[in-house]
């Protein structure tokens, strides 16, 4: 391959016994100098997916999250829906920013699945990720399915990040769920 299409796989990442010409699956991302780097490690999430990651550091440009690779993942301030602290677990989605870098966002609504396996009456666990006076409490069931405690039902004390025991009260045609904690 020409130099433009080459990607570095650091020698410590090369599996023992690998020979030139062997093929392998790698994950490619940009390092802090914007160079493409390959790794044989699997990150905790791929582009468009959601996952709960631990905040490893908070800096002046945002928070950094442990996502299973050597270089932590940036959660920019403008993608945070609330202030995060070191050591906290946060639900995020992975996206590609304007400069073609991988970043995290806490604005996960559009990344959550509407293909729920649950039916009315099922008991589920959900993580609060957003609270709206108009709509209610937005919850990610199993950290991946879209659900809502409608405003008329939302009577408890809710805060983003809190995990609730819920019951499915409705599954709409579009696959989104209404849930209740009553």
Pin down the residues of each PLM region.
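Single-stranded RNA-binding regions, centering on S1/OB-family and related RNA-binding modules
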Residues: 1-182
């Amino acid at each position: 391959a020409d130099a433009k299409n080459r990607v570095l796989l650091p020698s410590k990442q090369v599996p023992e016994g690998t020979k030139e010409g062997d093929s392998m699956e790698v994950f490619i991302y940009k390092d802090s100098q914007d160079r493409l780097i390959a790794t044989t490690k699997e990150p905790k999430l791929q582009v468009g997916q959601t996952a709960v990651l631990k905040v490893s550091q908070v800096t002046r440009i945002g928070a950094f999250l442990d996502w299973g690779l050597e270089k932590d993942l940036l959660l920019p301030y403008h993608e945070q829906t609330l202030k995060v602290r070191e050591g906290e677990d946060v639900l995020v989605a992975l996206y590609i920013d304007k400069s073609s870098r991988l970043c995290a966002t806490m604005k996960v609504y559009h990344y959550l699945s509407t293909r729920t396996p649950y039916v009315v009456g099922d008991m589920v666990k959900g993580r609060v990720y957003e609270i709206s006076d108009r709509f209610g409490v937005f919850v990610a069931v199993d950290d991946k399915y879209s659900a809502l405690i409608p405003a008329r039902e939302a009577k408890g004390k809710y805060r983003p990040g809190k995990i609730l025991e819920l019951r499915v009260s409705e599954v709409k045609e579009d696959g989104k769920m209404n849930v209740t904690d009553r």
